[in-house]
From Swiss-Prot:
This is Probable molybdenum cofactor guanylyltransferase. GTP binds at L16, A17, G18, K28, D75, D107. NCBIfam families: PRK00576.1 (NF001855). It is found in: Cytoplasm. Transfers a GMP moiety from GTP to Mo-molybdopterin (Mo-MPT) cofactor (Moco or molybdenum cofactor) to form Mo-molybdopterin guanine dinucleotide (Mo-MGD) cofactor. GO terms for cellular component: cytoplasm. Belongs to the MobA family. It catalyses: Mo-molybdopterin + GTP + H(+) = Mo-molybdopterin guanine dinucleotide + diphosphate. Coiled coil: none annotated. GO terms for biological process: Mo-molybdopterin cofactor biosynthetic process. Keywords: Cytoplasm, GTP-binding, Magnesium, Metal-binding, Molybdenum cofactor biosynthesis, Nucleotide-binding, Transferase. It comes from Mycobacterium ulcerans (strain Agy99). The keyword Endoplasmic reticulum does not apply. One of its GO terms (molecular function) is metal ion binding.
Length: 201
């Protein structure tokens, strides 16, 4: 694992790729980005992998993915939202020995290692359980989570919660104001796709 503050902590990565992609009309993870032959999941893994080790991909049962050089964990149940997948990813990261995990959605082609570094820096300085970016709204799926929150996720899911906001609301959460929203942008329709994407920097 290379990179500044992320070298000082045990940081895993969790990429949530199993969303239903209703607005896009097709699976976002395997969407080929403009200007090349790289899929969205491969592009995001290329960025996350620069700062995180190991990296886990959370995918739906039966969801086709390109060959990946990281563990793929399949959802046990469909349609339960991102919280259960986040919890499973945090547990896998904890079992791998990581204290923190960067959890992100797969549909973030503008993601940068600088964003991850900023969040990690705050995690080190504050020792918060959750560190997430804020640009007028909270971005729960581009955030640092302590891996020991996996059991709290289990309790929230058992209580009927499905959104990652429930985890942040029940945790010691630090929000970092971001002046640049581009790394946080999600791709929901074909019109949201950027011009040929450069690797995050």
């Amino acid at each position: 694992m290379a990179g500044r503050e992320s070298d000082a902590v045990s940081l895993a990565g969790v990429v949530l790729a199993g969303g239903e992609s209703r607005r896009m009309g097709r699976d976002k993870a395997t969407l080929v980005l403009p200007g090349g032959s790289t899929t969205m999941v491969e592009h995001v893994l290329g960025i996350v992998g620069q700062r995180c080790e190991p990296v886990f991909v959370m995918a739906a049962q039966g969801q086709p993915l390109p060959p990946l050089q990281v563990p793929v964990l399949r959802d046990e149940l469909r349609g339960l939202g991102p919280l259960p997948a986040t919890g499973r990813g945090l547990r896998a990261a904890a079992e791998a020995g990581a204290r923190f995990a960067f959890v992100c959605a797969v549909d973030m082609p503008g993601l940068t290692v600088d964003l991850i570094d900023d969040l990690v820096r705050s995690a080190i300085e504050t020792d918060a359980e959750v560190v997430l970016p804020w640009d007028g709204r909270s971005h729960y799926l581009a955030a640092i989570y302590r891996t020991d929150l996996a059991e709290r996720v289990d309790a929230l899911v058992a209580a009927g919660e499905r959104k990652t906001s429930a985890l942040a609301d029940s945790s010691d959460t630090q929000r970092i104001v971001m002046s640049d929203s581009a790394p946080l942008a999600n791709v929901n329709t074909a019109a949201d796709l950027p011009a040929p994407v450069r690797p995050g920097h």
